Amino acid sequence: MVPIKLKGRTISRGCAEGEILISRDPISFLGSVDPKTGIVVEEKHSLAGKSIKGKVLVFPHGKGSTVGSYVMYQLKKNGAAPVAIINLETEPIVAVGAIISEIPLVDMLEKSPYESLKDGDVVQVNGSEGYIELIKPKGSKIEE
């Protein structure tokens, strides 16, 4: 397999590896995600009922209140946060939340993550150098 590596823009430094969870819907961390469990509680959201805990969360951008940054921090303190985030374009609420929570975040990839990635793929997000790398496609027989 030829490795897929996509360059992007660094928003929050750090490196993390995990399984992709994709949403085409924006996320408001205040009111849409339970800060204790990491479960998306917004009924009409595409991720309703799913946990973002330990995932590499892919979504277009954030929405809603500036308090969302502190909800992200609360998720991290509760062990319920995503391990990394990939956005199409990050806005200040999610950027601040990722930085204060030390969650690696990359956006503006050279190719849309919706074209390159799918739920269950394992990727590394390198927020320090501004890239993501597909480690293991979903269903791959590659041994870890």
UniProtKB/Swiss-Prot annotation:
<comment type="pathway">
    <text>Isoprenoid biosynthesis; isopentenyl diphosphate biosynthesis via mevalonate pathway.</text>
</comment>
<feature type="active site" description="Proton acceptor">
    <location>
        <position position="65"/>
    </location>
</feature>
<dbReference type="InterPro" id="IPR002840">
    <property type="entry name" value="PMDh-S-like_dom"/>
</dbReference>
<comment type="subunit">
    <text>Heterodimer composed of a large subunit (PMDh-L) and a small subunit (PMDh-S).</text>
</comment>
<dbReference type="GO" id="GO:0019287">
    <property type="term" value="P:isopentenyl diphosphate biosynthetic process, mevalonate pathway"/>
</dbReference>
<comment type="similarity">
    <text>Belongs to the AcnX type II small subunit family.</text>
</comment>
<keyword id="KW-0414">Isoprene biosynthesis</keyword>
<comment type="function">
    <text>Component of a hydro-lyase that catalyzes the dehydration of mevalonate 5-phosphate (MVA5P) to form trans-anhydromevalonate 5-phosphate (tAHMP). Involved in the archaeal mevalonate (MVA) pathway, which provides fundamental precursors for isoprenoid biosynthesis, such as isopentenyl diphosphate (IPP) and dimethylallyl diphosphate (DMAPP).</text>
</comment>
<protein>
    <recommendedName>
        <fullName>Phosphomevalonate dehydratase small subunit</fullName>
        <ecNumber>4.2.1.182</ecNumber>
    </recommendedName>
</protein>
<dbReference type="Pfam" id="PF01989">
    <property type="entry name" value="AcnX_swivel_put"/>
</dbReference>
<dbReference type="GO" id="GO:0016836">
    <property type="term" value="F:hydro-lyase activity"/>
</dbReference>
<dbReference type="InterPro" id="IPR012016">
    <property type="entry name" value="PMDh-S-like"/>
</dbReference>
<keyword id="KW-0456">Lyase</keyword>
<dbReference type="InterPro" id="IPR020794">
    <property type="entry name" value="PMDh_S"/>
</dbReference>
